């Protein structure tokens, strides 16, 4: 059973896609952070860098947008039948762009001039003549039928589209309704863009809740449960426009417990941020995201079944492959991903593990590419990350360790304190009183290991060294005055 749960509060909105009680996808949005992916801006070319084949575009945000020159097409009139072609832009020129990737770290948002307007059943591309279908529609007859229906609707030849997965099984009337809605939207966008000067926000895409409903609420979802009356009404109004037949599947949560708690989802959400992911067999994954790549290590842990080493490795890796695909979706991990499976001698076992991983990734909405599996069980893959990582919305860099995950040891800090004491006394030989403020644990270690040496310094430099305890001080925070 597949459900969508929506938790809407003043401070944040959350959406969870749950399959048979297991959290499969999780989204969060706050007033302080709203995604800009899908937004359309009228921007101004700020600079062009031929060496990287890109332009930086001023769109009115903190960071300038990044636009590959290969992503530039000739602007066209609203719904006009004119030839679409690539051309060069000049500094200071205005351009209509859409955000396709969130600003991450020091990088600005990724932009394109290939505008895509997502409806219920298709994505309209008014400045592009590309036409295609979702790769998840696999039946050839259905693919042919859908393309035929769009031909009957007779879209202008220069207007592109992509038929979405949810269009599977839909009739001409439903598709035509979507086309009319998107054409009307594009006319509004074009008109607004013509009346405004850059930089300007021209169109703001739906918030995270309505995006999830638009992209994931289909006949396979048995229920959409919402815990807010206001949000319930808003979603109903949205569905009346996009898909009335799904209104019967929406439900207002009236339980005593909070929705995510009652559905046993809150604890699963907390586990998204953990480094270790434990599997039912007793094996576990270690997930290490870094600035440049993500490393996932598979460990046998307390694997309970009695197999020989080869079959044990195969069984653990098969279980891990499916869970890894789920974790990539849940955490929205992207970039280069290296998966270190347990070594397997047999080639057929390696192929089967890779097959399970690929099958488990089929429902992933993000673009991905799997390079293969080596004889050492290492899989290299890439996965597109469009939004900011879930973790970055809920956590910030630890001010104590400054994001390292480690602090200097007491032994290291003791050496530092003694060196600083000696340096201070050498530079100020007439100083008769030295005050040292430091962490209590560090002081205990310092006196336990070096009390005699400190007394030696006092005698040699004819001074008094006093210590002040600072219970809230960082272990690396030492003051000598």
For each feature predicted by the language model, list its residue ranges:
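A short alpha->loop->secondary-structure connector
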Residues: 74-76, 111-119, 141, 240-248
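Phosphate-interacting basic helix/loop segments used at nucleotide- and nucleic-acid interfaces
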Residues: 26-28, 32-51, 81-103, 143-149, ...
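Conserved glycine-centered short motifs in functionally critical loops
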Residues: 53-55, 63, 102-125, 182, ...
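Loop/turn-to-beta-strand initiation segments
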Residues: 91-95, 197-198, 249, 293, ...
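Charged, low-complexity intrinsically disordered tails
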Residues: 131-266, 273, 390-481
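Charged, low-complexity terminal tails
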Residues: 1-112
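Metal-dependent catalytic core segments for phosphate chemistry
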Residues: 237-267, 271-276, 280-319
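Active-site phosphate-binding and catalytic loops of NTP-dependent enzymes
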Residues: 2-4, 24-35, 78-87, 104-112, ...
């Amino acid at each position: 059973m597949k459900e969508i749960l929506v938790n809407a509060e003043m401070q944040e909105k959350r959406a969870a896609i749950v399959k048979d009680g297991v959290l499969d996808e999780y989204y969060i949005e706050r007033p302080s952070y709203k995604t800009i992916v899908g937004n359309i801006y009228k921007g101004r070319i700020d600079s062009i860098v031929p060496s990287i084949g890109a332009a930086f575009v001023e769109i009115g945000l903190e960071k300038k947008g990044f636009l590959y020159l290969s992503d530039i097409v000739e602007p066209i009139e609203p719904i006009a039948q004119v030839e679409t072609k690539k051309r060069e832009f000049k500094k200071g020129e205005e351009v209509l762009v859409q955000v396709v990737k969130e600003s991450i770290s020091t990088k600005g948002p990724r932009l394109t001039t290939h505008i895509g307007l997502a409806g219920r059943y298709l994505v309209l591309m008014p400045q592009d003549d590309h036409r295609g279908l979702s790769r998840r529609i696999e039946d050839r007859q259905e693919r042919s039928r859908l393309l035929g229906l769009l031909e009957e609707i007779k879209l202008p030849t220069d207007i592109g589209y992509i038929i979405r997965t949810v269009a599977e099984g839909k009739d001409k009337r439903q598709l035509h309704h979507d086309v009319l809605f998107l054409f009307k939207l594009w006319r509004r966008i074009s008109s607004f863009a013509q009346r405004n000067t850059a930089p300007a926000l021209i169109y703001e895409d739906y918030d995270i809740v309505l995006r999830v409903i638009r992209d994931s609420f289909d006949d396979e979802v048995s229920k959409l449960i919402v815990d807010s009356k206001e949000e319930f009404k808003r979603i109903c109004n949205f569905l009346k426009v996009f898909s009335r037949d799904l209104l019967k599947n929406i439900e207002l949560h009236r339980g005593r417990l909070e929705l995510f708690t009652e559905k046993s989802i809150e604890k699963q959400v907390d586990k998204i941020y953990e480094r270790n992911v434990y599997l039912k067999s007793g094996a576990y994954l270690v997930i290490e995201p870094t600035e440049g790549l993500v490393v996932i290590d598979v460990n046998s842990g307390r694997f309970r079944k009695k197999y020989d080493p080869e079959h044990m490795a195969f069984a653990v890796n098969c279980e891990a492959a499916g869970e890894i695909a789920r974790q990539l979706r849940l955490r929205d991990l992207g970039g280069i991903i290296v998966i270190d499976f347990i070594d397997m001698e047999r080639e057929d076992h390696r192929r089967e593990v890779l097959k399970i991983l690929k099958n488990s990734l089929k429902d992933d909405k993000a673009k991905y590419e799997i390079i293969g599996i080596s004889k050492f069980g290492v899989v290299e893959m890439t996965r597109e990350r469009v939004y900011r990582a879930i973790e970055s919305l809920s956590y910030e860099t630890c001010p104590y360790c400054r994001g390292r995950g480690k602090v200097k040891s007491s032994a290291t800090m003791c050496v530092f304190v003694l060196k600083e004491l000696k340096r201070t006394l050498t530079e100020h030989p007439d100083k008769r009183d030295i005050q040292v403020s430091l962490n209590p644990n560090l002081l205990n270690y310092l006196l336990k290991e070096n009390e005699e040496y400190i007394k030696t310094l006092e005698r040699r430099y004819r001074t008094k060294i006093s210590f002040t305890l600072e219970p809230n001080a960082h272990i690396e925070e030492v003051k000598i005055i």
